[in-house]
Amino acid sequence: MSDKIHPVPKQVKAQALIDKEKYLKWYEESVENPDKFWGKHGKRIDWFKPYTKVKNTSFTGKVSIKWFEDGQTNVSYNCIDRHLKTNGDQVAIIWEGDNPYIDKKITYNELYEHVCRMANVLKKHGVKKGDRVTIYMPMIPEAAYAMLACARIGAVHSVVFGGFSPEALAGRIVDCESTFVITCDEGLRGGKPVPLKDNTDTAIHIAARQHVHVSKVLVVRRTGGKTGWAPGRDLWYHQEVATVKAECPPVKMKAEDPLFILYTSGSTGKPKGVLHTTGGYLVYASMTHEYVFDYHHGDIYWCTADVGWVTGHSYIVYGPLANCATTLMFEGVPNFPDQGRFWEVIDKHKVNIFYTAPTAIRSLMGAGDDFVTRSSRSSLRLLGTVGEPINPEAWEWYYNVVGDKRCPVIDTWWQTETGGHMITPLPGAIDLKPGSATVPFFGVKPQLVDNEGKVLEGAADGNLCITDSWPGQMRTVYGDHERFIQTYFSTYKGKYFTGDGCRRDEDGYYWITGRVDDVLNVSGHRLGTAEVESALVSHNLVSEAAVVGYPHAIKGQGIYCYVTLMAGHEGTDTLRQELVKHVRAEIGPIASPDKIQFAPGLPKTRSGKIMRRILRKIAEDDFGALGDTSTLADPAVVDDLIANRQNKATA
């Protein structure tokens, strides 16, 4: 924990939308009188039918979350149509291609046409309100058009990250029974093609075996690469949009009508379909975007995430566009053609607000300062981080080297489930401590509890819960409300349990310490240990597997796998490589194991439960105090694991 404090810079304070006094006043009202506070701020979006009810939520019993429930609106209308009269010619999306010489600017007028045409294509092929549409796309403007087109006609989109495998894509198609997929011939990442259409074809075959049949696939031509083609099912996007009008009226949606499903890893094997609805989500995404990034009209804003993750939903597409912002969409990677790419893009497009992940910061820090200092970065006003806690060393480098000691670093803590920022500094109001997410956003009531559920006051270390609802909160797990209740509200009754550990210091600042459940945070992406374990066990030579996280210099957390093989088989380096490939094929490259330790047995209690605490300690090369091992069925297993650990500190 860093003791250093960076006060709000004078020039930031002078032009900030929210100062300390306003933050304290608004925050108090937001938690003391949420109906009044959100009743006022709900009007930041346009409503076809104004709401009269604001908050109707319960964290007990059946758990029900409703905001602005009698209002009617449309997300696509709020992100596009309402800006056309005064800002139609303003750039909505700057697209920066994988190739540094290719970019494109799309105005709000052009965005309107693209989205209406895509919406009309969906309607032409039978997609209607409530239908689920799967989007498996690279970071190209058509991915945003697809999301907004679904929102326009009331279809529910399920965006699947383009780095996920066909198996992972199939699982998500099956779970939400999607019959329409939007994809691309190939993606481009770091100069290499990604076979998205071929992956889609494989996924559709897998889904069909589970009785979910995709009837149409809309394919955007990105590279012109060869792909399979199913006549009657597959449609070229460029051909289809040429046949429809560039106008499509937005459907009136109830505030609680579903907007999207986004799958996220849980502590059990099957990913959860996080369901977000229309009104509350957009109010919260747009409000957090404006105040957390101190967004002023005319700012060029760049979030480096992918639309396949919630950060891309809330802070590339919906939040910025609802605020009539100019949002930059980046197809590439931070180290292609070299490690200076981010800083070159900032100079090229005069970016004012830059939002990225600690993993990227640590990786670029390792490449040295020269890549940064050869660029000017003079347009930058604000830096942000997202996805995982940032270590103070990386924070200081980001602040000192990238931001030239003049740009506040906004360290945001939130989740797929929360829809938007929860604990975060506001640039003009909150002094910064490197490594701390600082204080709660308006309407957010954090609480620390110990493992028994006792509430901890003052400076404390515990499990982070939120005690009341906020408009951006997920409403349910798609198709499984019981799982929603069990996952988030059963551990500590009447509270939303985040799954994160947290420390609160004597100034009331919050420091996120990482997951306390069986979920890894690898490069800012959540991954369930159970998912990786089931991928390993699906290999014909693996009898049993246990997966834990360990500290990783770049990724934050690395993936450490303990693998027991079938009788008669020996662990070799070749098999290690084969297992890494196998996991990549089952889930995707983000799940690649960093360390695989072959183990004759795993530490189990007499009842057969694996003692993960011991496995974590060994993976961390910290086995001096393993705690009580008396309940182990075979304590000798531990000695073997220690002797053969893969993470020995080098002398």
UniProtKB/Swiss-Prot annotation:
Entry EC number(s): 6.2.1.1
Catalytic activity: acetate + ATP + CoA = acetyl-CoA + AMP + diphosphate
Alphabetical keyword list: Acetylation, ATP-binding, Ligase, Magnesium, Metal-binding, Nucleotide-binding
Keyword check for ATP-binding: yes
GO cellular component: cytosol
Top enzyme category: ligase
InterPro entries xref list: Ac_CoA_lig, ACAS_N, AMP-bd_C, AMP-bd_C_sf, AMP-binding_CS, AMP-dep_synth/lig_dom, ANL_N_sf
Modified residues (N6-acetyllysine): K609
Family as reported in the entry's similarity comment: Belongs to the ATP-dependent AMP-binding enzyme family.
Protein name: Acetyl-coenzyme A synthetase
Organism: Rhizobium etli (strain CIAT 652)
